[in-house]
């Protein structure tokens, strides 16, 4: 992948991951799949939509981690459901998502796109969790290139910030935009 730019690497990694998961039977007709958020997850969603459109996959039910992914699924014909829907029953067969950083021990940072809570809920309720990433996400130790996202409710902002700063953390408030929706 050395001759590809970062965007091309992400697309190749995502498409290859979905193709491999289909070939190995981990993505299959009738499954309930979690679909992640971000620049690597979206090409995976696009490839999944192509399998649905050509009839290779049928009756796939997706639960998404963000407004961004929900819109992409609508545009590309991937049926979206909620954990509240009876056909999902609060459990997914597999989730596929990207990451912000991954170290050699497979520790990772997620949630940098401001969809952390939904990403955690979907991952927790999936039997299998697949992370797709290009080489730019590889680090020797997580937290070296990307800040650790912490999602809190507005009412808890001041006390949580105070406690984190007492522990030596540098806190920066980031308001949800783009992937989180309006």
Where are these regions (language model features)?
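Conserved phosphate- and dinucleotide-binding cores of soluble alpha/beta proteins
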Residues: 2-12, 51, 68-182
């Amino acid at each position: 992948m050395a001759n590809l730019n970062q965007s091309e690497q992400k697309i190749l990694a995502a498409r290859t991951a979905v193709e491999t998961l289909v070939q190995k039977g981990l993505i299959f007709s009738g499954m309930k799949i979690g679909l992640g958020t971000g620049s690597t997850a979206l090409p995976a969603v696009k490839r999944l939509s192509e399998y649905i459109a050509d009839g290779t996959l049928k009756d796939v039910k997706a639960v998404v981690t963000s407004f961004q992914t929900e819109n992409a699924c609508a545009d590309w014909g991937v049926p979206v459901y909620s954990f509240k829907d009876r056909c999902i029953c609060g459990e997914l067969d597999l989730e596929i998502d990207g990451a912000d950083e991954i170290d050699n021990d497979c520790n990772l940072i997620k949630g940098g796109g401001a969809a952390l809570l939904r990403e955690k809920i979907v991952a927790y309720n999936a039997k299998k969790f697949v992370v797709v990433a290009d080489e730019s996400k590889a680090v020797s130790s997580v937290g070296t290139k990307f800040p650790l996202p912490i999602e809190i409710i507005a009412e808890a902002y001041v006390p949580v910030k105070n406690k984190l700063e007492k522990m030596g953390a540098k806190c920066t408030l980031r308001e949800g935009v783009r992937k989180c929706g309006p």
